[in-house]
Amino acid sequence: SLFGRRDGQGDIVMPGAFADSLRKRGSGGVRMLFQHNPAEPVGTWLEIRETARGLYVLGRLDKNVQRGRELFSLLESGGIDGLSIGFRTVAAKADRIVKARRLLNVDLWEISLVTFPMLDGARVSNVSSASRALADSLFAKGPTPKRTNA
């Protein structure tokens, strides 16, 4: 999602719109789906955060899922590269001048890899086996144990 840009449905996501949801859910609470289909989870989001430009995501496709393997191949070849958000509107304001709905606060529950995103600029910008290997190692390490003074 890019801030301040109107999508194909007439929505404009405003800076800060994801903040509450990300604070409550974290990256692990937002699902990675294919084409918004809840029956097709394809991986996990490792990092989701707001930047000055919009929503930044870093994810890992699950190689143990057939669709995950297919999507990795399609992403590498450029056959698919769209991203789209699934959310519930918490607060919005109608903008009659540009005939759009400005999304001020949304409850983000999923981000999908899609063929045709509603916002043309919402695209995957980097696909790498190396970053997937790093992601696998980060998951394998687990949390750092807390030190205690006994």
Model-derived segments and spans:
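Signature of dsDNA virion morphogenesis modules
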Residues: 1-141
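Short, charged, intrinsically disordered terminal tails
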Residues: 138-150
